[in-house]
């Protein structure tokens, strides 16, 4: 894009979400992600016990469910996320981008995945990514 920047100067929505969570739930808390490996890595590096919802243990409730783009979204993923949210997990979205451009066309974005989870759970998430204030607070 023509802007001079180092990697340390770039803050993506996954990193911003992990930073925001540090101020809202205790370190080491179980956090389940509906998202790609990069999201799980950011959550782990922030000090949480993070894993994809498909790897969630059968018992207990996560402290938070974090939802972003998940190109392997399944019905079971939605069902597990819904269960944890309905049983008290904090519901956080990395962003609500409905689409993103790729290979000359638009593809469903993280916001489409967030909308599916929100509809299933009947709960709206805390949104961290642009243009929400959580991005600046992170």
For every predicted segment, state its role.
Residues 1-138:
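HAD-like aspartate-dependent phosphatase fold
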């Amino acid at each position: 894009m023509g802007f001079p920047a180092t990697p340390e100067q770039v803050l993506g929505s996954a990193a911003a979400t992990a930073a925001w969570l540090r101020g809202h739930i205790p370190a080491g808390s179980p956090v389940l992600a509906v998202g790609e490996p990069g999201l799980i890595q950011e959550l782990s590096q922030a000090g949480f016990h993070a894993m994809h919802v498909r790897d969630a243990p059968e018992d207990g409730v996560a402290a938070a469910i974090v939802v972003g783009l998940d190109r392997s979204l399944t019905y079971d993923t939605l069902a597990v996320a819904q269960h944890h949210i309905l049983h008290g997990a904090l519901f956080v979205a990395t962003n609500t981008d409905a689409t993103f451009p790729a290979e000359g066309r638009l593809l469903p974005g993280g916001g489409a995945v967030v909308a599916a989870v929100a509809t299933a759970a009947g709960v709206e998430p805390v949104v961290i990514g642009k243009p929400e204030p959580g991005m600046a607070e992170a």
